């Protein structure tokens, strides 16, 4: 929005030309989202406390979590607000990739909001009925995926980028829709599963979004895209603004979510952020890179799948509790130790993922 305004004002004052620089807008997008989160935090927490929107804790969870009962949840509202406002201010409104991300972000945020509302108001730990949750998540994911397929059919926008192989970029055809669907829905649920400890989900989200900001910049720059042997996508550059907004909003939220948390993001935050990371990976044609950089989310999800599968097939559990972060809690690890070690692993995986762009 401000970019368009600056384009009209630059003829009166050349200094407004700074708004055309992607790096400048990326920095101010991050700072804008950060300050909005920090400003909203105390007000959001006070409002949630007044409404008695407190966390519902399962009775079969770790005993250390019982003290979290009643902590304000649905703090993801301030994350989404910060991201959306920052993106609308600093990104080109005409960019279709930006609107794809905002569609998934807001759509999944609404689904998460309904889920959280049922939990905190009706005191139902299950929240929104699973089949309805997945139905609406699927509708949004398939709708966006189908639109992207029609717009980018038989172009680099629907090719599959394979790590380590610079000349292997098969055209996916209709399989693109299926792949995009699983990436968006899967990542939304993966981040949701990871959000079980104070700050555990938000920092890996920040790391992955920061990594994708660099990838988006390279993908939207023809020279760097050719140098790295990745598809050049002319709309990809504006995703830098989206990614840095996620980073800023995430850091602002972490100020209040760090151990011991004053507020939880809830499903309104985790589903939305996961879906956003998923669609960003799809738009950049970096689904494999998401698996590497988001390895913490992948392991958390696999631990649940393996736990459920093992119990149904063998009647035995692999872990003391799933997702796997609870397993380490029950082994005696203090919560801050689990959180920080997962952060370290996440940062390492993001750096490894970025390195694969050059190893081709």
Swiss-Prot record:
Its EC number is 2.7.8.13. It is found in: Cell inner membrane. It is an enzyme of class 2 (transferase). Keywords: Cell cycle, Cell division, Cell inner membrane, Cell membrane, Cell shape, Cell wall biogenesis/degradation, Magnesium, Membrane, Metal-binding, Peptidoglycan synthesis, Transferase, Transmembrane, Transmembrane helix. Its main location: membrane. One of its GO terms (cellular component) is plasma membrane. Pathway: Cell wall biogenesis; peptidoglycan biosynthesis. It catalyses: UDP-N-acetyl-alpha-D-muramoyl-L-alanyl-gamma-D-glutamyl-meso-2,6-diaminopimeloyl-D-alanyl-D-alanine + di-trans,octa-cis-undecaprenyl phosphate = di-trans,octa-cis-undecaprenyl diphospho-N-acetyl-alpha-D-muramoyl-L-alanyl-D-glutamyl-meso-2,6-diaminopimeloyl-D-alanyl-D-alanine + UMP. Its cofactor is Mg(2+). The keyword Cell inner membrane applies. One of its GO terms (biological process) is regulation of cell shape. It holds the Pfam family MraY_sig1. The chain crosses the membrane at residues 26-46, 72-92, 94-114, 132-152, 168-188, 199-219, 236-256, 263-283, 288-308, 338-358. It is a multi-pass membrane protein. HAMAP family: MraY (MF_00038). Belongs to the glycosyltransferase 4 family. MraY subfamily. Catalyzes the initial step of the lipid cycle reactions in the biosynthesis of the cell wall peptidoglycan: transfers peptidoglycan precursor phospho-MurNAc-pentapeptide from UDP-MurNAc-pentapeptide onto the lipid carrier undecaprenyl phosphate, yielding undecaprenyl-pyrophosphoryl-MurNAc-pentapeptide, known as lipid I. This is Phospho-N-acetylmuramoyl-pentapeptide-transferase. It comes from Enterobacter sp. (strain 638). The gene is mraY.
């Amino acid at each position: 929005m401000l970019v368009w305004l600056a384009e009209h004002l630059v003829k009166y004052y050349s200094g407004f030309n700074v708004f055309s620089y992607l790096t400048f807008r990326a920095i101010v997008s991050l700072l804008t989202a950060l300050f909005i989160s920090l400003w909203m935090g105390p007000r959001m927490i006070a409002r949630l406390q007044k409404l008695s929107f407190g966390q519902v804790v399962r009775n079969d969870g770790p005993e250390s979590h019982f003290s979290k009962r009643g902590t304000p949840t649905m703090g993801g509202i301030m994350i989404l607000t910060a991201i959306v406002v920052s993106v609308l201010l600093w990104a080109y409104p005409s960019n279709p990739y930006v609107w794809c991300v905002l569609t998934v972000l807001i759509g999944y945020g609404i689904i998460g909001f309904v889920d959280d509302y049922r939990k905190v108001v009706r005191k139902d730990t299950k929240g929104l009925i699973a089949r309805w949750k997945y139905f609406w998540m699927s509708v949004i994911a398939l709708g966006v995926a189908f639109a992207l397929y029609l717009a980018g059919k038989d172009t680099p926008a629907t090719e599959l980028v394979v790590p380590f192989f610079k000349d292997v970029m098969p055209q996916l055809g209709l399989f693109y829709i299926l792949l995009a669907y699983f990436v968006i829905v899967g990542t939304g649920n993966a981040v949701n599963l990871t959000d079980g400890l104070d700050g555990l989900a938000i920092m890996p989200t920040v790391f992955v979004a920061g990594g994708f900001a660099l990838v988006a910049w390279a993908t939207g720059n023809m020279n760097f895209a050719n140098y790295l042997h990745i598809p050049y996508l002319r709309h990809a550059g504006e995703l830098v603004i989206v990614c840095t907004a996620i980073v800023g909003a995430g850091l602002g939220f972490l100020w209040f979510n760090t151990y011991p948390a004053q507020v939880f993001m809830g499903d309104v935050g985790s589903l939305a952020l996961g879906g956003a990371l998923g669609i960003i990976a799809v738009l950049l044609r970096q689904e494999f890179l998401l698996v590497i950089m988001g390895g913490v989310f992948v392991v958390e999800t696999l631990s649940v799948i393996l736990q459920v599968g093992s119990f149904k097939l063998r009647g035995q559990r692999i872990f003391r509790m799933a997702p796997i972060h609870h397993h380490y809690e029950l082994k005696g690890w203090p919560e801050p130790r689990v959180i920080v070690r997962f952060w370290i692993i996440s940062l390492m995986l993001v750096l490894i993922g970025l390195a694969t762009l050059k190893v081709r």
